[in-house]
Design a protein with these regions (language model features):
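Noncatalytic scaffold domains of N-terminal-nucleophile
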Residues: 1-194, 199-201, 206-242, 248, ...
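Short, well-ordered beta-strand elements
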Residues: 4-5, 65-66, 242-249, 256-263, ...
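Active-site rim segments in enzyme catalytic domains, especially the processed small/beta chain
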Residues: 39-56, 60-64, 218-220, 320-382, ...
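A short, polar/proline- and glycine-enriched secondary-structure boundary/capping micro-motif
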Residues: 74-80, 255-259, 332-337, 391-395
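Active-site-proximal alpha-helical segments within enzyme catalytic domains
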Residues: 107-115, 179-190, 256-263, 315-324, ...
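Conserved phosphate/anionic-ligand binding catalytic regions in large, soluble enzymes, centered on
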Residues: 199, 203, 251-256, 391
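Short, small/polar residue-rich loop motifs at catalytic or cofactor-binding pockets
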Residues: 231, 306-309, 368-370
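Internal maturation/activation junctions in enzymes
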Residues: 259-327, 336
Length: 395
């Protein structure tokens, strides 16, 4: 079978090539690419990432979406309620919060497990082989991680004892330092044998929760167990000769893409002002908790009538197409010592938590601007995606 891959992470290409003798399909390549990136692209993503997926099913000629983004803990009853805010020169200047109290429950393994169950043709033990081997033997950081860690390594990743040991070599020499993740390799090997749900209800979740509880975080066993995907919360609309399919509310990324496309079709003399106004409108009106799903979908309906992130796209000659965007926020700096997993800081992303640090999120999906999309034209199907946070709205 012929498979195409487009990715912002170069180790994921090597991961795909490692499967070539097994005749992989697009789902297989997607899974091994994503797992590999969560190992290697430290800081940009992590093994506790949230994800949005758009895909086209060739057998039924149907479009679908899966929302596996972060869910807030039901309550904030951990011991640490302090906002550990740091600043860094990344992107000029940015502030974010570190610490395990910024962790929210990610859906990446639910997403990948769903795709593997429906489309996968190769056992997880084979799909995980390359990232496991890479974690065991060690690797140099990919360029996106280097670019980010030049700004974030000291303030965000060297304060935590476990992370400090892991990154000691790259702290000495960012360009040629080697990262070895033996514990993470063991964790992924275990996951490949017992299944990805172990992150939510098995030994892996117990170890992650042990770190969260001992260091003052708020996620609980029930938060992990009760995590659910949101499937087919999507929109389908036309823009000139393009048919666009993406995630609708509660994610706001798809809406923002449509808003910008709408602005680009208005008076060209006021183009810059129009685009700036879209960004301001988002900040003022779309970033809130409550019934965001209905509000965003209503906004999308109006348009169709009148976004630290990795992107992976795969397609195959069975006409299956996948577009996934996944993120770990800026990273909490916390590494779970018994699993080797770095933890996200989704609750600590200041620009995506308008309710304030540990404010009322109503046990909802957190706000995302990520926007993986499927595009259909008379020439066929294409996949596309964008980073999230403020980047999609201010780039």
């Amino acid at each position: 079978m012929k498979v195409s891959l487009a990715s912002t992470a170069h180790y994921s290409v090597e991961a795909a090539e490692s499967l070539k003798d097994l005749n992989p399909n697009a789902a297989d390549v997607l899974i091994t690419s994503v797992i590999t990136s969560m190992v290697t692209d430290i800081g940009v993503v992590s093994p506790t990432s949230g994800a949005l997926l758009s895909y086209f099913d060739g057998s039924s000629s149907s479009f679908h979406t899966i929302d596996g983004y972060f869910n807030s803990p039901k309550n904030f009853k951990g011991n640490d309620h302090e906002e550990h805010r740091i600043s860094m020169t990344y992107g000029g200047y940015v502030e974010t919060c570190k610490g395990v109290n910024t962790f929210a429950i990610p859906g990446i393994y639910k997403v990948l497990n769903t795709i593997h169950d429906r489309y996968g043709s190769i056992p997880l033990s084979k799909l995980f082989e390359y990232p496991i081997e890479l974690a065991k033997r060690g690797f140099n950081l990919p360029q996106p991680s280097k670019d980010y860690l030049r700004h974030s390594l000291e303030p965000l990743f060297m304060w935590h004892a476990t992370s400090k040991r892991t990154l000691s070599d790259v702290y000495e020499n960012l360009d040629s330092g080697v990262v070895v993740l033996t514990k993470l390799a063991d964790t992924l090997e275990h996951m490949s044998l017992v299944g990805m749900d172990d992150f939510y209800i098995g030994d892996i979740s117990k170890e992650v929760l042990s770190t969260i509880m001992s260091e003052g975080g708020h996620a609980t066993k029930n938060d992990f167990k009760d995590y659910n995907l949101l499937e087919d919360y999507n929109f389908i609309t036309k823009s000139k000769d393009l048919k666009l399919i993406g995630n609708a509310g509660p994610s706001i990324g798809g809406l923002m893409v449509l808003k910008y496309l709408d602005a680009l079709q208005t008076n060209k003399s006021n183009l810059k002002e129009n685009l700036i106004n879209v960004y301001k409108e988002r900040k003022a009106h779309y970033e809130f908790f409550g019934n965001r799903e209905q509000f965003i979908n209503n906004q999308i309906s109006k348009i169709t009538q009148s976004p630290s992130t990795i992107q992976v796209n795969t397609s195959d000659d069975s006409n299956n197409h996948f577009s996934i965007t996944f993120s770990s926020g800026y990273g909490s700096g916390v590494q779970c010592k018994n699993t080797g997993m770095y933890l996200n800081n989704s609750l600590g992303e200041i620009e995506l938590n308008p309710q304030g640090f540990l404010g009322d999120t109503k046990n909802e999906r957190l706000i995302s601007n990520m926007s993986p999309m499927i595009i259909e034209t008379d020439k066929g199907i294409s996949t596309i995606g964008s980073p999230g946070a403020d980047r999609i709205s201010s780039a």
